[in-house]
Regions:
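Short acidic, glycine/proline-enriched helix-loop-strand junctions
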Residues: 133-151
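A short, internal acetyl-CoA/4′-phosphopantetheine-binding micro-motif in the GNAT/acyltransferase core
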Residues: 92-99, 127-128
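Conserved GNAT acetyl-CoA-binding A-motif
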Residues: 115-128
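Conserved N-terminal entry element of GNAT/NAT acetyltransferase domains
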Residues: 1-29, 159-160
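Conserved beta-strand-loop-alpha-helix junction that forms the acyl-donor binding cleft
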Residues: 125-135, 156
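Conserved acetyl-CoA-binding loop-helix of GNAT-fold acetyltransferases
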Residues: 100-113, 139-140
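Acetyl-CoA-dependent GNAT
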Residues: 25-91, 108-110, 114, 118, ...
Length: 160
């Protein structure tokens, strides 16, 4: 489990409070909260966005289904998929009130660690090309080794 450093308590300055955010594998009882997070984060629903499918994911590949928890509330999530050949990042989402705190970047880094531990040498992120804020986020991760693959509109990096 990774904890963020304290965020500061200067509310008049616009800074967040001192609550820490923990990143860890999702628990079965948190799947409904993840679905709600995806909805409030503006994710486009897919056929697998059901409580049953997420609970199955927790059961079968739970170490790659990560959540960010603040004050017992799911404020972020990411799915790190491993197919035995390449690691893939899906469904990166952060609650609007938890944005601009590098939480999405922390979730991506933790997902990369999970996949590296499984043997992944290359990572890929599926990004919806019409989501300008998402594309901007991944472009910003060039400092972490991510680069855009123009042929497929995906981002890849070595999992070193």
């Amino acid at each position: 489990m990774i904890r963020a450093p304290p965020m500061g308590r200067k509310s008049r300055m616009g800074l967040r409070d001192d609550a820490t955010i923990a990143i860890r594998p999702c628990r079965r009882e948190e799947c409904a909260a993840v679905l709600a997070l995806w909805e409030c984060a503006g994710a486009i629903p897919s056929a697998t966005d059901t409580l049953e499918e997420l609970q199955r994911l927790v059961r079968t590949h739970g170490d790659g289904f990560l959540v960010a928890i603040q004050r017992n509330t799911v404020v972020g999530s990411v799915i790190a998929g491993w197919d035995g050949w390449r690691g893939n990042i899906y469904r990166l989402a952060v609650a609007p009130e938890a944005r601009r705190r590098r939480l999405a970047q922390r979730l991506v880094r933790e997902a990369a660690l999970v996949m590296r531990a499984k043997g992944s040498r290359r990572l890929s992120a599926l990004v919806e090309s019409h989501e300008a804020h998402a594309v901007g986020f991944w472009d910003h991760l060039a400092a972490d080794g991510w680069r855009r693959d123009e042929r497929m509109m995906r981002y890849i990096r070595a999992s070193d």
